[in-house]
Amino acid sequence: MSTVADTRLLPGKPVRARILSEVSAYVNQVGRIGKLVSISIGNVPEVAVYVRNQARAASAVGVPFDQQLWDRSISQEVCQSLIREMNDDPDVLGIILQRPVPDHINVRALQAAIHPLKDVEGMNPASIGNIVYNDVAMAPCTAAAAIELIRETGLSMAGLEVVMVGHSEIVGKPVAMMLMAEGATVTVCHHMTRSDAMHSRRADVVVVAVGKAHLIGPDMIKPGAVVIDIGINHVPGPDGPVVVGDVQTDAVKDVAGWITPVPGGVGLVTVAILLRNAIRAHQQQRAAGWIH
């Protein structure tokens, strides 16, 4: 049953609070837990904001957080060597690779270098592949956050008609696979889809992750549908740039049954999922005999 008071808006704050409470309780129960290591390659201000948010949330639930800033000139080989050392370090619970990275760095190769049991972001190819087999224990954080918010509506996933607008490896494809694992019927729209609206107008749930401000309008949404807006865009405002999603929120909320705000929706839950993945990593590492 939904805990949301306003059925038009589906904020991330209560979901985030619940997940972080569960993480905190687990950390208190086990007593001692390894650290999360955040890797930033080069000094990117936007990345620094994400790292601060992650560090603050980790501190609040008692998970040690090590922020590492590597020089942007570091080589691919040195990066992979350092990651392998972390894989072998029992004091490292999980590894977070911040993006973007410099052009000379192959981000996929670094994601693949992170051991699946320390892949708290869920971006190792093995972690992505596990979703196909309905194993979503370490799913990509943003995708898992979107699923968590759909659950918050109280709707049963089984048989739900869902349209996923966007098919990125980080969000769109994992969301689609995770929803299929839950029994939903999923249609994925992308840049070659002839008409997004033709599909979205019949959907019970529309999830949007494209990176185009105000792409989805009220004429594209079925009355009463759930709209999960994952987009983050910066557009000019009267007092400077403002953050908006891929959905025309004010107009669409008059049609939709539930809609996530931007900011304050999926993004808030994403960091909580990262920390939930951390305790799942701890459970899996303990089951594998890595830690006691």
Swiss-Prot record:
E.C. no: 1.5.1.5, 3.5.4.9
Leader sequence segment: none
Catalytic activity: (6R)-5,10-methylene-5,6,7,8-tetrahydrofolate + NADP(+) = (6R)-5,10-methenyltetrahydrofolate + NADPH; (6R)-5,10-methenyltetrahydrofolate + H2O = (6R)-10-formyltetrahydrofolate + H(+)
SUPFAM superfamilies documented for this protein: Aminoacid dehydrogenase-like, N-terminal domain (SSF53223), NAD(P)-binding Rossmann-fold domains (SSF51735)
GO cellular component, one term: cytosol
Molecular function via GO: methenyltetrahydrofolate cyclohydrolase activity; methylenetetrahydrofolate dehydrogenase (NADP+) activity
GO biological process: L-histidine biosynthetic process; methionine biosynthetic process; purine nucleotide biosynthetic process; tetrahydrofolate interconversion
Entry keywords, A to Z: Amino-acid biosynthesis, Histidine biosynthesis, Hydrolase, Methionine biosynthesis, Multifunctional enzyme, NADP, One-carbon metabolism, Oxidoreductase, Purine biosynthesis
The protein's role, per its UniProt record: Catalyzes the oxidation of 5,10-methylenetetrahydrofolate to 5,10-methenyltetrahydrofolate and then the hydrolysis of 5,10-methenyltetrahydrofolate to 10-formyltetrahydrofolate.
Quaternary structure, from the entry: Homodimer.
Protein name: Bifunctional protein FolD 2
Organism: Ruegeria pomeroyi (strain ATCC 700808 / DSM 15171 / DSS-3)
